Structures are given as structure tokens and as C-alpha cells.
């Protein structure tokens, strides 16, 4: 009987961690904050349960990054959310983000699952964000490591993607399993990317990416990309980037 009670107590202690939790609460930004928030940043709001980014991006304005970070720190998890962007728009989901003031941007530490209007690969001139984003697309037309569903500049999506049109809702399901070194992405219930989180395959992709060329990016400051993907535990992040972006039905579940 004593052993049975101990087992029940163990299950009771573990179960809350394994439940799906909504990340949009009270129709507000409760549970979220701006990257390195100084009380002056703006651009995100919640309307009717929809999380909205609606401002000129920091990339375009030169203002400090206003990406949105979770208050809670995560390690291994699965997350599901619906998203939509405007024509030519660009956003992203990051994990493992560290908020030390030594970093100027969340993407200095956090890998990114790319969200972008895929039609800009057919008409690059339609991409929002000026020459920087235009050159990103033009330099990636073949490899598609910055395409919709890519782990940005590391792993291209697989197979034929079938996103809903720009302006309609799409769904991402993302699993980050640090314990088993596995990442997975589904677009509208179809697996489009599977990738490691460390190890030889990751290292090989990293060596070929811009993240291995820190000296070419002095605007990042002293830390550059030296700590990229080094933090297994970190905040999750929705990116401040060109174009309006909308997110709803954001749910997360810790794996362990």
C-alpha cells in the first residue's frame, strides 16, 4: 500500500508538467515580455485571442529588437500554434534564447524556425525588409535554407510544402527534444523538417552557415554568434521582423 501511494504521489507531481498549456491568457500579453524590455518597446498586442505584431520592424527602423519572449524557460517541449503573415512578410519562432545584455538580438543564441511568404522565392522583389531581406532570398533560391519551414540557414524543409495562401491561417507543430537530440516540424499536420539539435550533422550545417562567420557581422557586438545554439534551456521567442504577423491557439507542453 505504501508503495502504491508513493507511485500516485509521483504521478501527481509529474502530471502538471505534461499537460498542454495555453500561452495566450486573459486576452493579454501575460506570460510574455519584450526582449531585454526597458519599458519603452512596443509592437505586440492581443485582440480576440490573437497575438499580433504590427509595427515597423527593428530591421527597418533601426530601433532595438522588439521580439516577444516567454517569461518561462523551456528545455524539451512541443508547441502548436496557428500563424499568418502579410504578403512579402517574414517572422519566426526561436528556442533556447538567452537574454543577457551582452546580446543585441535573440537570434544570437536562439535557432529559428522560419516563417516567410514562400511566394517571395518566385518574386524576390516582393519581400519586405529592403535590401537585407532581398539579398537573403536571392542568395538562397537553390538551397532554401531560409525558406518557409527551414531551420534558418541550417536545415532546409523536405518535400513539397503545401501552405495555405498568404493571409490565411497555417499551423506549425514543433518538437524540441533535447534529451533525445531531435527536432521536428509539421506544417498543417505534415512533417516538413526533422533535424538534430547537436552532434556531427548539426556541426556540419553550422560550419556552412552564416553563424560560423561571426567576424563578418560586427553589428552584433562582441558576442557575435559565438554562443549560438549553446543554451539547451532558454526562452521561446516570436520574432520582430518585417510585416504584420498573427498568432493564435498557442499551446505548449513540456516533455519531461
Regions found by a protein language model. Name each.
Residues 3-12:
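Sec-dependent N-terminal signal peptides
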